[in-house]
């Protein structure tokens, strides 16, 4: 069956035809992928795309890297779920702790959503406070406390504050704009906020960077008012550096949430932080967390194998240079008003606007022009996120020949749009 036929079936089986809403943003219907290798994905329709979505971030080595695949196959021969601890969870935790400065102890879960949900509960349990402070357009997963002025597909489908989130929960969530320290200072003064949670680099409203001293200011304010600081590094962890955004900016939170890359493309999440805080999780403490698939062997071995490759440094050299080259070429080629926010191997283009420093700015960008840009690139065999409010990623598989091919296609598309 081709993609159109599969889409017709999917609409009869799933709400909106998909199991995660951003997938429906590709028009007139999503294409269905049957395999991926390196920088490419291949559809059931026989089409080949250069992939800059990369599973929305986890695939920093590209699709199906041999070094990771081999270890997964070996583990499958031994078994994939036991309901007991395994040595693999110790090995992956040690690797994470060796690179993430704030990670004294770790609790593995199964997704970024689970990680932020557990981290918020942990912060409340530790501080004995009920409120949290988050930032407009920061996306921390699909649970109630996160779906208040959320980014990602929540913005794309105009449900930044989701139906079904009780008003009682909304009242426990304070909101500030990203990069606004004065707002944070005012909100924290009542000393009733358990935690300030943020993406240190916003990756779900496009890419939005922290301004100078913003992260430092948050660290100082949370210390002053006895609130915990949570960095949601589900996207940035092991991406903008092997030590994440906290190493890149040298600002260290009390709690870090991780996901995506640490599972090598398999479901995973983690809550990491100071031992005295993490030890409040059951069975050591009274903050409950559990999961049938927590620290499952397949996710553990995929994460170990991925980090082992990242420790060789070459993936960062290739992926970062690929992004840098693409950004430079886009700046050279684009004649329309725009801005590009970029760090490491992640970037996003905002059309019709000179600066994007927060969620309000991102929403003023020309979304319709971005959609045209996406659609024209898709016709040329280049897959970037279908939503303005996502991130363009590069990987270790995006080598010089792939980038040269992409630039040729960009020249054609931008020439037509200009």
Curated annotation (Swiss-Prot):
Q: What species was this sequence derived from?
A: Saccharolobus solfataricus (strain ATCC 35092 / DSM 1617 / JCM 11322 / P2) (Sulfolobus solfataricus)
Q: Indicate what this protein is called per its UniProt record.
A: Glutamate-1-semialdehyde 2,1-aminomutase
Question: Which keywords label this protein?
Answer: Cytoplasm, Isomerase, Porphyrin biosynthesis, Pyridoxal phosphate
Q: So, what pathway does this thing act in? A: Porphyrin-containing compound metabolism; protoporphyrin-IX biosynthesis; 5-aminolevulinate from L-glutamyl-tRNA(Glu): step 2/2
Family to which this protein belongs:
Belongs to the class-III pyridoxal-phosphate-dependent aminotransferase family. HemL subfamily.
Q: What is the lineage of its organism?
A: Archaea, Thermoproteota, Thermoprotei, Sulfolobales, Sulfolobaceae
Compartment(s) of residence: Cytoplasm
**Which GO biological process categories is it annotated with?**
protoporphyrinogen IX biosynthetic process
EC number(s) per UniProt?
5.4.3.8
GO CC annotation: cytoplasm
- Cofactor names: pyridoxal 5'-phosphate
An example of a GO molecular function for this protein is: glutamate-1-semialdehyde 2,1-aminomutase activity
Q: How is its activity regulated?
A: Inhibited by gabaculine.
Assembly, in brief, is: Homodimer.
Query: Which HAMAP family does the record associate with it?
Result: HemL_aminotrans_3
**Superkingdom per UniProt:** Archaea
- In the UniProt record, what gene is named as encoding this protein? hemL
Does Nucleotide-binding count among this protein's keywords? no
UniProt keyword Isomerase, yes or no: yes
User: Mind telling me which InterPro entries this protein's record contains?
Assistant: 4pyrrol_synth_GluAld_NH2Trfase (IPR004639), Aminotrans_3 (IPR005814), Aminotrans_3_PPA_site (IPR049704), PyrdxlP-dep_Trfase (IPR015424), PyrdxlP-dep_Trfase_major (IPR015421), PyrdxlP-dep_Trfase_small (IPR015422)
Q: Which residues are recorded with the post-translational modification N6-(pyridoxal phosphate)lysine? A: 260
């Amino acid at each position: 069956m081709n993609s159109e036929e599969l889409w017709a079936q999917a609409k009869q089986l799933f709400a909106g035809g998909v199991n995660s809403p951003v997938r429906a943003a590709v028009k007139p219907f999503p294409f269905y992928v049957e395999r991926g290798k390196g920088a490419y994905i291949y559809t059931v329709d026989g089409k080949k795309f250069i992939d800059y979505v990369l599973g929305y971030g986890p695939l920093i080595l590209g699709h199906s890297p041999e070094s990771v695949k081999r270890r997964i196959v070996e583990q499958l021969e031994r078994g994939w779920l036991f309901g007991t601890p395994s040595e693999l969870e110790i090995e992956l935790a040690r690797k994470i702790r060796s690179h993430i400065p704030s990670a004294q102890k770790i609790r593995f879960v199964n997704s970024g959503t689970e990680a932020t949900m557990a981290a918020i509960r942990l912060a409340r349990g530790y501080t004995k406070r009920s409120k949290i402070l988050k930032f407009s357009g920061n996306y921390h997963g699909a649970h109630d406390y996160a779906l208040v002025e959320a980014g990602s597909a929540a913005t794309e489908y105009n449900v930044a504050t989701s139906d079904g989130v009780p008003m009682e929960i909304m009242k426990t969530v304070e909101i500030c704009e990203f990069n606004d320290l004065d707002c944070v200072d005012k909100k924290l003064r009542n000393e009733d906020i358990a935690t300030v949670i943020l993406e240190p680099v916003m990756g779900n409203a496009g890419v939005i960077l922290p301004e100078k001293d913003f992260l430092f200011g948050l660290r100082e304010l949370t210390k002053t008012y006895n609130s915990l600081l949570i960095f949601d590094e589900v996207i940035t962890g092991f991406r903008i550096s092997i030590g994440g955004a906290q190493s890149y900016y040298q600002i260290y939170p009390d709690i870090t949430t991780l996901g995506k890359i640490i599972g090598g493309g398999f479901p995973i999440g983690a809550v990491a932080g100071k031992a005295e805080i993490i030890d409040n999780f059951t069975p050591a403490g009274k903050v409950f967390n559990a999961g049938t698939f927590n620290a499952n062997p397949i996710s553990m071995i995929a994460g170990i194998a991925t980090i082992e490759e990242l420790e060789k440094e070459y993936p960062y050299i290739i992926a970062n240079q690929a992004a840098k080259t693409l950004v430079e070429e886009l700046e050279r080629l684009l004649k329309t008003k725009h801005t590009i926010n970029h760090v490491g191997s992640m970037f996003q283009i905002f059309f019709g606007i000179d600066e994007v420093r927060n969620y309000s700015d991102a929403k003023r960008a020309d979304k319709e022009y971005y959609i045209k840009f996406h659609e024209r690139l898709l016709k040329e065999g280049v897959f970037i996120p279908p939503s303005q409010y996502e991130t363009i990623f590069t990987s270790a598989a995006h080598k010089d020949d792939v980038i040269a091919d992409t630039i040729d296609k960009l020249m054609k598309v931008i020439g037509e749009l200009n």
